Amino acid sequence: RRLGARDRVALVAYAGASGVVLEPTPGDRKATIEAAIDQLEAGGPTHGAAGIQLAYAKAREGFIPGGINRVLLATDGDFNVGVVGHDALVDLVKRERAHGVALTTLGFGTGNYNERLMEQLADQGDGAYAYIDDLQEARKVLVENLGGTLLTVARDAKVQVEFNPSAVSE
């Protein structure tokens, strides 16, 4: 609801085969965006790599120089069609990151949920990772937190922590 006319939203689905649900659309066309979201359904085999590639292509198509250009991947991470190896998917995200489009992963589901892959993809895509398990968490992540994390303020930041051995034991 906070998107404006200068923002762009595109939606790609990748259950079974990948396809565009919504071409890059100005953010102030909320009814169009909401109608496209309402069409989405979970189910079928997951061709994640093809969906990610198509999402990056749409992000480059709607690229805004100097803007925040990001793919949001909402999935359980159980990619079971096409490129399914973790290393191949991470390499895909690394290559696409060079185009100036970040990747944030939003994890959903239980059972086959692949948290490790979701974290790796977000890390290699210069993005954030969040797990959403209910409506309250969705609101927190998508409305309250995500807006504050879309702007990258540091890359490849490292933190070194040294504990006082007299205060901390193994």
Over which residues does each language-model region extend?
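Exposed acidic/Ser/Thr-rich ligand/metal-binding surfaces
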Residues: 1-160, 165
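Glycine-rich, Lys/Arg-enriched anion-binding loops that position phosphate/diphosphate groups
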Residues: 167-170
